[in-house]
């Protein structure tokens, strides 16, 4: 009962009818965080696209200026010098045929958060689509995870590069940091992600592109964001409205 009272108290602080400016939303999210551990801060978008149509798929990557607060575990499919370069860059798991067979059997799937592969191995890695695809982990040239420069890819992912892809319900969601981050760090991470989502707007998408946006912490209430705010994100009031 104590836990539910805490959650209700946090929920009561959020105005469900209001669209919050990013800075205001971040402050409120941190205030209403109910976990004893350092919770994550996540953003979710509902986009005005039909992901069933190839020309309306929204998929990309963004380098968050302050990272996510979590160091991603990276698996790399590579051989020879490329495998050595991946290991030197800090890859957590590196291998080729034997590792591909392990993953195909569904083993070790909880040991990594991102996958990189060299182009020459994609013929073999391709058969992992039914295992890695649903988890959003399939290497893709468009996101820089199919590359000969595996060291660079590993370094970027470890440094806070995140990959996003709209789901079948037209939603996008990803972590922008931890509750322990400063307000400015969280807003700047949000701004970097928002800029990239706007840049990737499909020309075939009609009507309003970002229909809804919300920010929340682990076990915290959802806070609706004013998705029209794309500039002056570190200002609590919208200068255009003053």
Swiss-Prot record:
GO MF annotations in UniProt: rRNA binding; structural constituent of ribosome; tRNA binding
PROSITE patterns hit by this protein: RIBOSOMAL_L1 (PS01199)
One term under GO cellular component: large ribosomal subunit
GO biological process: regulation of translation; translation
CDD domains, per database record: Ribosomal_L1
SUPFAM superfamilies hit by this protein: Ribosomal protein L1
Keyword Repressor attached: yes
Assigned keywords, A-Z: Repressor, Ribonucleoprotein, Ribosomal protein, RNA-binding, rRNA-binding, Translation regulation, tRNA-binding
Keyword Membrane: no
Described function: Binds directly to 23S rRNA. The L1 stalk is quite mobile in the ribosome, and is involved in E site tRNA release. Protein L1 is also a translational repressor protein, it controls the translation of the L11 operon by binding to its mRNA.
Subunit structure: Part of the 50S ribosomal subunit.
PANTHER family in the record: 54S RIBOSOMAL PROTEIN L1, MITOCHONDRIAL, LARGE RIBOSOMAL SUBUNIT PROTEIN UL1M
Family designation: Belongs to the universal ribosomal protein uL1 family.
HAMAP family recorded: Ribosomal_uL1_B (MF_01318_B)
Name assigned to this protein: Large ribosomal subunit protein uL1
Organism: Streptomyces virginiae (Streptomyces cinnamonensis)
